[in-house]
């Protein structure tokens, strides 16, 4: 009788604890993971636009959920904000080098919030969208979305980060953690097309602005493709909201500034655009405008992927071939400004090294144009035969008089550097000048 009672008690205990047999008792899980459900249409995206901005913590937590989607190649904490909040980069596609990568960056300015909700909805659509809408797109492009660059600013309702820095003026000097992370993300995904999402105060009937890069240093193929893409977005907004609702971003004192996102990453080699929705509109309408423009970019690149891929590849190939006028920039490890110059170059992903041998080099100073030929073995240099050398020229010659926003230029640091006007034998060395 006792054996029967004990047996019943054990059976009841196992049943109540969720264990249904010996395998469960010994922690062997026989459950089958449910397949991921692709259940959302583009119409759901429009229907779910919020009427008020979403908290930064909710955006972060909800974005983590997309790691379960088979379409998400990587969901990376690419870095952290000044206050330690995770900065999330979501990637779709296997980064096939034969198709372009489209990259969206949301809300460098914390008080321009609509782009974050738009970026989240865009990420959700590609993570959960029905196959007939999403799969044909991801067969033609790779997609990356930096969902929220400045969560600290979003929490505070401020333009700058927790240090009060305007992140969209930090792309040259890279002093802020968020600025460094944006550069790291760009180098990681190597996009053909980059879109920087913002907001503006509004101007009468103008509810949306689009801007292509205007820095003359930009590779001509990249610049041309940027203007084609800009025109397509303007036409798409006009068709939906009416003629006169969208315009080019007006020229300002910073139109050519390399420290601004759209110019900076265009000089690095990516087709580039700026979006701005008008804060004079209802919040939901601002999110809709941002989302509509983002979809317009994606559709345009999907329609002609080779054109945008070729623009990026033209810039890359030029970089690999090098500059046939300035072959390198030479500078001394003993120069007090050199450690900061090396930090900036490295943070931008550029190789640095030293001159191999004592042969003379025909060169001129970047600012005074005074000649110099004697550079000893071990002289520091940054070679120009690498992808993005147009940005090297900007970093090594940028002066504070060129634009009001960049105050960490070689001239301001009193960096002496010489343009090598002939080829230089060199050795790449990531520890260059570390002992000085």
Question: Predicted regions span which residues?
Answer:
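Secretory targeting signatures
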Residues: 1-28
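M14 metallocarboxypeptidase catalytic domain recognition
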Residues: 19-436
């Amino acid at each position: 009788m006792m054996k029967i009672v004990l047996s019943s008690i054990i059976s009841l205990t196992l049943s109540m604890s969720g264990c249904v047999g010996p395998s469960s008792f010994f922690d062997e899980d026989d459950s089958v993971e449910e397949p991921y459900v692709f259940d959302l249409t583009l119409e759901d995206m429009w229907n779910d636009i919020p009427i008020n901005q979403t908290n930064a913590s909710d955006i972060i937590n909800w974005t983590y959920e997309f790691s379960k989607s088979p379409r998400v190649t990587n969901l990376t904490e690419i870095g952290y904000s000044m206050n330690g909040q995770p900065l999330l980069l979501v990637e779709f596609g296997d980064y096939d080098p034969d198709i372009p990568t489209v990259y969206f960056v949301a809300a460098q300015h914390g008080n321009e919030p609509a782009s974050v909700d738009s970026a989240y909805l865009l990420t959700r659509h590609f993570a959960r969208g029905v196959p007939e809408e999403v799969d044909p797109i991801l067969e033609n492009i790779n997609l990356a979305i930096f969902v929220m660059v400045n969560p600290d600013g979003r929490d505070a309702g401020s333009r700058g980060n927790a240090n009060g820095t305007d992140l969209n003026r930090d792309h040259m000097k890279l002093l802020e953690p968020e600025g460094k992370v944006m550069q790291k993300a760009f180098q990681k995904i190597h996009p053909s097309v980059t879109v920087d999402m913002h907001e503006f105060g509004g101007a009468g009937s103008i509810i949306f602005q689009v801007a292509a890069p205007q820095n003359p240093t930009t590779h001509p193929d990249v610049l041309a493709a940027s203007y084609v893409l800009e025109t397509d977005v303007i036409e798409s907004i006009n068709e939906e909201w009416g003629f006169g609702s969208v315009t080019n971003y007006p020229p300002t004192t910073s139109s050519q500034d390399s420290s601004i996102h759209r110019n900076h990453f265009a000089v690095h080699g990516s087709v580039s655009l700026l979006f701005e929705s008008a804060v004079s509109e209802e919040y939901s309408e601002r999110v809709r405008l941002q989302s509509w423009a983002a979809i317009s970019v994606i559709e345009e690149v999907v329609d002609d992927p080779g054109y945008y891929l070729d623009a990026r590849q033209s810039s890359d190939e030029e970089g690999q071939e090098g500059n046939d006028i300035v072959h390198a920039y030479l500078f001394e490890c003993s120069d007090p400004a050199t450690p900061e110059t090396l930090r900036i170059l490295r943070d931008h992903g550029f190789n640095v090294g030293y001159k191999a041998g004592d042969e003379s080099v025909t060169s001129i100073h970047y600012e005074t144009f005074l000649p110099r030929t004697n550079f000893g073995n071990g002289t520091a240099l940054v070679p120009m035969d690498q992808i993005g050398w147009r940005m090297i020229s900007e970093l090594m010659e940028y002066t504070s008089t060129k634009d009001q926003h960049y105050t960490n230029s070689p001239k301001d640091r009193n960096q002496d550097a010489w343009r090598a006007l002939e080829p230089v034998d060199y050795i790449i060395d990531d520890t260059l000048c570390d002992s000085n």
